[in-house]
Amino acid sequence: MGKEFLIKELFVKPKGILSLQKHHHRAEHWLVTQGNAKITLNKDIIIKKPGEHIFIPLEAIHRVQNPGKKPVKIMEAQVGSILKETDIVRYQDIYGRVK
């Protein structure tokens, strides 16, 4: 199967945090469009501001947090052979979705 593409917009509420996760079949490219995003990429913590971007490689452990008082918005471009929500391995999750 060839490479597929999917674009979606992520919203992270103030003081919110998404699950710590990785993907077996896709890489992601994030462009911050609003707020300051605190991004975990493997063992690194990176702050990205509006207009800044980051590449999340295949198999990289990652998450985004919003340490601020305003929502964070990120445009996410997914590239890979499988672009489904089933391609998520979660390590930490405040909603109890770690298997």
Model-identified regions with their sequence ranges:
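Double-stranded beta-helix
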Residues: 63-99
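Glycine- and acidic-residue-biased ligand/ion/polar-headgroup-sensing regions
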Residues: 5, 25-43
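A short glycine-rich, His/Asp/Glu-containing loop-to-beta-strand
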Residues: 1-27
